[in-house]
Curated annotation (Swiss-Prot):
Similarity annotation: Belongs to the RutC family.
Organism of origin: Escherichia coli (strain K12)
GO biological process, one term: single-species biofilm formation
Protein name: RutC family protein YoaB
Database matches in PROSITE patterns: UPF0076
């Protein structure tokens, strides 16, 4: 059994790959942005991670989106809808959660085929 851990630190790895399946969680870089921009930024990070591993967003199997404020649901969906590949939407769950950094409006966890 081979598990590849990319940029592993003491508490987490940036990316884990096992059995041609990639696991990744992204958080926004611009903490002063609104929910739409934070979501778009996080989705762009997901694109970059997938591309680096020879995959793309149409190969995402599952996405869990954590929102700090449920009132940001429409803004997050606007960014998501502009990004997701028509006909290739993954299973998706959106949860309101108290995120660890109070400036995070969104955090996105994905599982993708690689």
């Amino acid at each position: 059994m081979t598990i590849v851990r990319i940029d592993a630190e003491a508490r987490w790895s940036d990316v884990v790959i096992h059995n041609n399946t990639l696991y990744y969680t992204g958080v926004p870089e611009n903490l002063d942005a609104d929910a739409f921009e934070q979501t778009a930024n996080t989705l762009a990070q997901i694109d970059a991670v997938l591309e680096k591993q020879g995959s793309n967003k149409s190969s995402i199997l599952d996405a869990t989106i954590f929102l700090a404020d449920k009132n940001d649901f429409a803004a997050m969906n606007k960014a998501w809808d502009a990004w997701v590949v028509a006909g290739h939407a993954p299973v998706r769950c959106t949860v309101q959660a108290g995120l660890m950094n109070p400036k995070y409006k969104v955090e996105i966890k994905i599982v993708a085929a690689v």
